């Protein structure tokens, strides 16, 4: 008598295609599937995987951070690749000459990059220019930077917790007494 094997946990949970029905995104997936198969390079595998990702996992990257990473990398000829959005940062006064490839670049960021003598590429242009990912700098934004992530972690109020509490309102009466002032219990 055979053993009845439980196949309950057999499914591997990972995206094999993007959820979006955007035809342009799906064309890029088709292109990078081909490149990943034919070149067998890690760069193309990472790009393909990131094209599948949800918007939460493709956080935006500001020009300020791009400029900082670019300077630290010390590779003036490299192309910066971001599978996501590149946004402008008004606090950055001087934009260096950059070659940026991204899914989306905001209008002001694009203007500033072009004004500095740089260029903005699409992923199909990058595939022609650098099919193996040679001379590129692959960057991504901070996934934990969004406001929702500030609520995750140790419970608010416990020692050494910097977690933001879920509060109905930010008024005088809400989470402003015990632990916040010495007249009510203690001051943290």
UniProtKB/Swiss-Prot annotation:
Key word Ribonucleoprotein present: yes
An annotated GO cellular component: cytosolic large ribosomal subunit
Single GO BP term: cytoplasmic translation
Pfam families, per the entry: Ribosomal_L18
Gene Ontology terms, MF aspect: RNA binding; structural constituent of ribosome
Coiled coil: none
Location of the protein in the cell: Cytoplasm
InterPro entries in alphabetical order: Ribosomal_eL18, Ribosomal_eL18/eL18-A/B/_CS, Ribosomal_uL15/eL18, Ribosomal_uL15/eL18_sf
Sequence similarity: Belongs to the eukaryotic ribosomal protein eL18 family.
Protein name: Large ribosomal subunit protein eL18
Annotated source species: Drosophila melanogaster
Recorded name of the encoding gene: RpL18
């Amino acid at each position: 008598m055979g053993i009845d094997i439980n196949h309950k946990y057999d499914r591997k949970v990972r995206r094999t295609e993007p959820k979006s029905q955007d035809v342009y995104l799906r064309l890029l997936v088709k292109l990078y599937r081909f490149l990943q198969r034919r070149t067998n390079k890690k760069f193309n595998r990472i790009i393909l995987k990131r094209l599948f990702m949800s918007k939460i996992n493709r956080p935006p990257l500001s020009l300020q951070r791009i400029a900082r990473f670019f300077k630290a990398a010390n590779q003036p000829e490299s192309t910066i690749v971001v599978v996501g959005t590149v946004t402008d940062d008004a606090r950055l006064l001087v934009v260096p000459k950059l070659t940026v490839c991204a899914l989306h670049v905001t209008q002001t960021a694009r203007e500033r990059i072009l004004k500095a003598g740089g260029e903005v590429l699409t992923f199909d242009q990058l595939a022609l220019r650098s099919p193996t990912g040679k001379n590129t700098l692959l960057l991504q934004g901070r996934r934990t930077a969004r406001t929702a992530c500030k609520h995750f972690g140790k419970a608010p109020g416990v020692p050494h917790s910097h977690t933001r509490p879920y509060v109905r309102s930010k008024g005088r009466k809400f989470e402003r007494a015990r632990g916040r002032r010495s007249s009510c219990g203690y001051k943290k």
